[in-house]
Design a protein with these regions (language model features):
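DEDD superfamily 3′-5′ metal-dependent exonuclease/proofreading module
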Residues: 2-214
């Protein structure tokens, strides 16, 4: 079942940025049950989701959704003003799309990794961005999440995923507040990346409802 995680609270002064209106932005990250090696191809659509971790600005809560809970998540994504993630377009969305009856690419999305790539010409790992920008990194490498799933350590899996969600959110908030993020280059030097991001206009429309009411 979907679970709310009240112990995860703001570690970044976001409340001021939320004051103009109740933000309906969402930050998410997915974990999978298997690896590219398991499926024999670098194809995210072949992977099976174990869990999706989500931060909801509207309620200031972190929640996790197991595979069987995903129908409860889709309407909330459709009602959001913006979905934020790191490598959403290249990994999370292709994997999620096999579970979703609508078109995830039609939803308002900000992929922080792509925004950085546009400015510096190459991709950077979230861990390198988080450590340089926030002084805090990810909780580990992706294979750990697969092992947690295989070992039935669901609570560890939830914590692992939500740490990535929290780090992604805080990198995004840093860009909102300061207009830049940092990453560590191949020489180990921290580099600034200009990233002027504005809050989305609050969307007054009814939910897109591409998931057929599920």
């Amino acid at each position: 079942m979907a679970r709310i995680h009240p112990l995860f609270t703001f570690t970044f002064p976001c409340a001021i940025l939320r004051s103009t209106f109740m933000r309906r932005e969402i930050v998410l990250d997915i974990e999978t049950r298997n690896t590219f090696q398991d499926v024999g191809a670098y194809n995210p659509s072949l992977l099976k989701i174990s869990l999706i971790g989500v931060y909801f600005y509207e309620t200031d809560t972190f929640e996790t959704f197991l595979e069987e809970d995903l129908p409860k998540l889709w309407p909330r994504l459709e009602k959001s003003d913006r979905i934020i993630g790191y490598n959403l377009l290249g990994f999370d969305y292709p994997c999620m799309q096999t579970y979703y009856t609508g078109d995830l690419m039609s939803l308002p999305t900000l992929d922080v990794m792509i925004e950085i790539e546009k400015r510096i010409g190459h991709r950077v790992k979230l861990d390198d961005v988080a450590k340089a920008t926030l002084g805090v990194g990810k909780s580990g490498h992706g294979l750990m999440a697969v092992e947690y799933w295989k070992n039935g350590e669901i609570d560890k899996l939830r914590d692992y995923c939500l740490q990535d969600v929290r780090v992604t959110r805080d990198v995004y908030e840093h860009a909102l507040k300061n207009g830049f993020v940092r990453y560590t280059d191949r020489q180990g030097v921290a580099q600034d990346v200009p990233m002027p991001i504005e809050l989305p206009e609050p969307d007054q429309r009814t939910a897109i409802n591409l998931s057929l009411g599920l």
